């Protein structure tokens, strides 16, 4: 047994070794305190049973890269883009006018219905494989409008169906007016 402290051991270990030993790896660089709290509560609280899986819904912009921890990636660039409406451009998918625009198109509602069905079918299978969280990434061009609106709505739909999860918007506010 060595005389190093735990912190010395951590400092001396290559990051890859620590990552491989970790049961959970959480990238907090784009999380708010509330999002981190919800995720930690979901993963480690006494009320969180190990017979459940935590869906983590992440919106992102393809121009900033796919989230590295994504288990499933869905591309919503086929949906009509609010970016081209000058009134909607400075807003995000968190704003009602953008949400209303995105969801005024039938393909958005149809896509979400199919995605909810798919996730409700897949979650138990991922859980059986020992996963405690499933990162579902929803991407559009810049990560401001379509992906944010869909991720928020998906989070609320799953919650209504009794599936508690977390929603994160990785790229909201990054380069908001450029495409």
Where are the regions a protein language model picked out?
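Post-Walker A helix-loop "phosphate-sensing" segment adjacent to the P-loop in P-loop NTPases
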Residues: 155-165
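Catalytic cysteine-centered active loop of the rhodanese-like fold, especially the PTP/DSP P-loop
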Residues: 133-155
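C-terminal accessory "lid"/substrate-recognition subdomains
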Residues: 2-134, 159-161, 171-179
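A structural preference for short, hydrophobic beta-strand core positions in alpha/beta folds
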Residues: 167-169
């Amino acid at each position: 047994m060595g005389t190093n402290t735990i912190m010395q051991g951590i400092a001396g270990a290559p990051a890859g070794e620590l990552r491989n030993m970790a049961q959970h790896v959480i990238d907090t660089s784009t999380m708010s305190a509330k999002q981190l709290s919800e995720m930690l509560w979901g993963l480690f609280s006494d009320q969180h049973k190990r017979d459940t899986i935590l869906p983590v819904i992440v919106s992102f912009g393809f121009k900033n890269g796919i989230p590295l921890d994504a288990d499933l990636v869905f591309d919503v660039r086929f949906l009509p883009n609010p970016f081209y409406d000058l009134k909607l451009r400075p807003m995000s998918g968190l704003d009602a006018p953008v949400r209303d625009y995105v969801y005024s198109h039938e393909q958005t509602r149809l896509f979400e219905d199919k995605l909810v069905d798919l996730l409700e079918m897949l979650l138990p299978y991922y859980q059986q494989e020992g996963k405690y969280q499933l990162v579902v990434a929803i991407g559009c061009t810049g990560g401001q409008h379509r992906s944010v609106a869909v991720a928020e709505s998906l989070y609320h739909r799953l919650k209504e169906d009794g599936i508690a999860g977390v929603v994160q918007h990785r790229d909201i506010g990054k380069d908001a007016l450029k495409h």
